[in-house]
Amino acid sequence: MSTEHVSNVYSVESLLSNVEKSSVSPTESIEDRNEFMITEDVMSSWQRMAATISLQQKLLMMQQTMPRPPPVNILGNFPFGFLNAPMFWQQYLRSMAMGIIPQNPESPSASVWNRTPTPPVEIKPFHCQKCTKLFSTIAALEQHQQVHVSDKQFECKQCGKTFKRSSTLSTHLLIHSDTRPYPCEYCGKRFHQKSDMKKHTYIHTGEKPHKCTVCGKAFSQSSNLITHTRKHTGFKPFACDVCGRTFQRKVDRRRHRESHHPGHPEECVSASQISSDLSPKGYMTPPTSNGYLDSSDEFLNVFRLPAELLAIKAEMGEEMEEADDEEEKVLNLSVS
């Protein structure tokens, strides 16, 4: 049997013509009518088969003519272009052939390939008082606080500062011994840590890899970027325990104490600890009229957060204390 004959047998026109031929004229006998009469169920089955074959013909034509989509993630949440998978591509063609998705290239559905995936923005409103890390849920914050419960076992005998790891203590002892094993290849200046030497080389190369997402200003060190972002947010995490004045940098708080409260011991708390009485379980709550935030809009108004600032990585909050410790270390070296 030839291919042309097979296509004619299973075409929509041939099926519908068979249905028309099966109809019985009124002049035929009852026996002939019963013999050749097609019931409604049989008629509907013929029509369903005709519709199915019509759909298959459309799919075959679309598969031969339409180009496959590029590997683009149209939902923005999957790590691969799932429409390139055969099962999803067939489902998309079937929906287009049935008229569920229009074939007009100017329509929003057809232009789905040109959409740019938008990464989801995760807001972390819960703030740790001790290390300034941010978390999205209270449960994550409570789990993190267990880190601060454990005692620090390694203590520096010269200054009394304690550490959780012996490696951190060994690095700290280099400050007291003034051992600087890492020299700069450009100017010869030596540093205690290799990371400090690498940051220093940015001065010679002019490289500024850390860029502010709000104003576009670039910095050579991440600590400078973290301090800079506080100007946009108005966030002042360091507070004087004597007068309550808050500062964006730890070094500014220390200078304030030396000039305004020279007789008091060096015991300052963070701004989050001042507002701990206003928040449940000691979680940081921005200062408002009643001590709590009524809405997300009030949260944005308190911190003066522009929309672009929400895209800043939460990891920057994890580096805040490390950056301020670097400033404190530099100040100690300059004083000594």
Curated annotation (Swiss-Prot):
A zinc finger (C2H2-type) spans 126-148, 154-176, 182-204, 210-232, 238-260. Its main location: nucleus. Residues 253-290 are annotated as: Disordered. This is Zinc finger protein GFI1 homolog pag-3. The keyword Phosphoprotein does not apply. GO terms for biological process: negative regulation of apoptotic process; negative regulation of insulin secretion; negative regulation of neurotransmitter secretion; negative regulation of transcription by RNA polymerase II; neuroblast fate specification; regulation of backward locomotion; regulation of forward locomotion; regulation of neuron differentiation. GO terms for molecular function: DNA-binding transcription factor activity; DNA-binding transcription repressor activity, RNA polymerase II-specific; RNA polymerase II cis-regulatory region sequence-specific DNA binding; transcription corepressor activity; transcription corepressor binding; zinc ion binding. The gene is pag-3. Keywords: Cell projection, Metal-binding, Nucleus, Repeat, Transcription, Transcription regulation, Zinc, Zinc-finger. Pfam families: zf-C2H2 (PF00096). Expressed in the BDU neurons, the touch neurons, the VA, VB and VC motor neurons, two AVF interneurons and unidentified neurons of the retrovesicular ganglion (at protein level). It is found in: Nucleus; Cell projection, Axon; Perikaryon. Transcription factor. Plays a role in the determination of neuroblast cell fate and neuronal differentiation. Negatively modulates expression of several components of dense-core vesicles (DCVs), thereby, in a DCV membrane protein ida-1-dependent manner, regulating neurosecretion. Negatively modulates the transcription of its own gene, the mechanosensory gene mec-3, and also other touch neuron-specific genes in the BDU neurons; required for coordinated movement. May interact with transcription factor unc-3. One of its GO terms (cellular component) is nucleus. Gene3D superfamilies: Classic Zinc Finger (3.30.160.60).
